Every structure is written in structure tokens, then in C-alpha cells.
Amino acid sequence: MELAKVLDVLRAFEREAVDYVLVGGIALALHGLARATQDIDLFVAPDPGNVERAKAALRSVFDDTSIDDIAPGDLAGEYPTVRYVPEEESFVIDLIGRLGDAIRYEDLEFEEREVEGVRVRLATPRTLYRMKKGTARLIDRADAEALRRRFGLEDEP
């Protein structure tokens, strides 16, 4: 995935004042742990006003009326993830309100980092480790182990 496309989305999120945190493979890459990925994973504060700002940001990058199908309550519901597939692109954008009962937007620790002139709200290595260490997916467990080694992370008591 081209970093320029990711930064276009994050620049729009910054411009629209969206409360978000970048997680997933791209966040790992920005922490120096390269992993191939074809999605942009964004934890988004699930309040309706913030979801509307996220939609406005997406509309400013993608000329796609399907963005309007994202409802303000989607990220606060029983299945709090929306997968948006931009037309004519080879990646997807996952908007996440929470991960089950384990991790909510409010639980995330993040740092702000400038990447090619764009302010990025990036999950900390510890947050990424917490998100990935106990999942069933092998790739997530491998990511957790890489984070643990690289940043000297240990499980919390």
C-alpha cells in the first residue's frame, strides 16, 4: 500500500478534527516493524459527531456516495466496525469503535507523530501489543511478539 494514500486519509482526518488512533499494520510500520498490509485500521471515537466528521474526511478524499451509508451509530452498536472499500482502490479502511469488550477507544494510548507533514495519532507500542497478544490470528500473535522484543514489553500484572 502506498504511504501517500494513507497520508491523504490521515490528512483529511486531521483537517476535519476526527478523534482517531491509527492501529494495525501501518501503525507497526511507523514504529519500524515492517509488515505487508492492505488495510488502514483506524480506531474512531464512536460518538455520532465524530463519526460524521470521519465521513466528511472520507468524502474529501474519495468521490464515493457509499460513504453516506455509514450511520452515526454504527461504531457504537453490537458490531462496532465498518469496513469501507474505496472505489478503484486496492485497499480497505476499517473504522473501529471497539474490539469486543476488551478494548474501547477510551482505552487506547497514542502518541502524535509528524509523518511527511501530516500529524498522525499513532497507537503506542504497548497499546498495539495489548491489542494483538491474545488474539486467535497467527499474524497478530507474531506482531505481538515482534513488539515485545523490539520495545522490551512484558505482560501487565
What are these regions (language model features)?
Residues 1-157:
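Compositionally biased terminal segments of proteins
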